[in-house]
């Protein structure tokens, strides 16, 4: 029993030291990539991967008390990744949490305050490739479709979701785990499925 308690204490100390180390690395990464960031940003288990195209030519703003968890119990064994293209705008509000989430921003993604995003979720404001096969073959990057995403305050997005280009998720709404969101969701509603559909009002 004593050994077990000692092991738990040691493990907790290691985790605490590790979290502070990875938080420091993330602060350094944000500083050198011209990210505007607030206070008390928390990183657990591994610092997020931050990829800012062309030496910080996009715009990233991260608010206060934002938490990034990578490789945690509910992270789908994923690391948090933030990828922002040239001239794109990513804004993350206060008191928001991400668990093994990938954000890819080519135009504009806005995440409000008090938002929770579950493990393995992907947020893409772009199709990544042209829809037309001939344009894909010729790698016509200018033909790729993209549109802004807005996730309003107090939204909860379950694990393993895909949030696709051009959608707005209204305040206090819930997206069920494993959903693919292809159209906008009004406030105070639960949606789920592939593609996500209305389930009930809150």
Regions found by a protein language model. Give the residues of each.
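Glycine-rich hexapeptide-repeat left-handed beta-helix
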Residues: 3, 111, 117-202
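Domain-scale signature associated with acetyltransferase and cell-envelope carbohydrate enzymes
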Residues: 1-124, 152-153, 171, 187, ...
């Amino acid at each position: 029993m004593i050994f077990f308690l000692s092991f738990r204490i040691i493990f907790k100390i290691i985790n605490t030291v590790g979290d502070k180390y990875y938080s420091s690395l993330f602060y350094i990464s944000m500083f050198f990539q011209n990210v505007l960031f607030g206070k008390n940003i928390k990183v657990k288990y591994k610092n997020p991967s931050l990829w800012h195209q062309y030496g910080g030519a996009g715009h990233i703003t991260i608010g206060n008390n934002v938490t990034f968890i990578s490789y945690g119990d509910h992270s789908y064994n994923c690391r948090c990744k933030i990828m922002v293209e040239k001239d794109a705008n990513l804004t993350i509000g206060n008191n928001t949490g991400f668990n093994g989430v990938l954000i890819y921003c080519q135009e504009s993604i806005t995440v409000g305050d008090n938002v929770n995003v579950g493990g393995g979720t992907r947020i893409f404001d772009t199709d990544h490739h042209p829809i037309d096969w001939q344009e894909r073959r010729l790698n016509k990057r200018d033909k790729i479709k993209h549109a802004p995403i807005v996730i309003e305050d107090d939204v909860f997005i379950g694990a393993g979701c895909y949030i696709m280009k051009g959608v707005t998720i209204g305040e206090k709404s819930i997206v069920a785990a494993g959903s693919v969101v292809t159209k906008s969701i009004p406030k105070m509603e639960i949606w789920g499925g592939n593609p996500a559909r209305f389930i009930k009002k809150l």
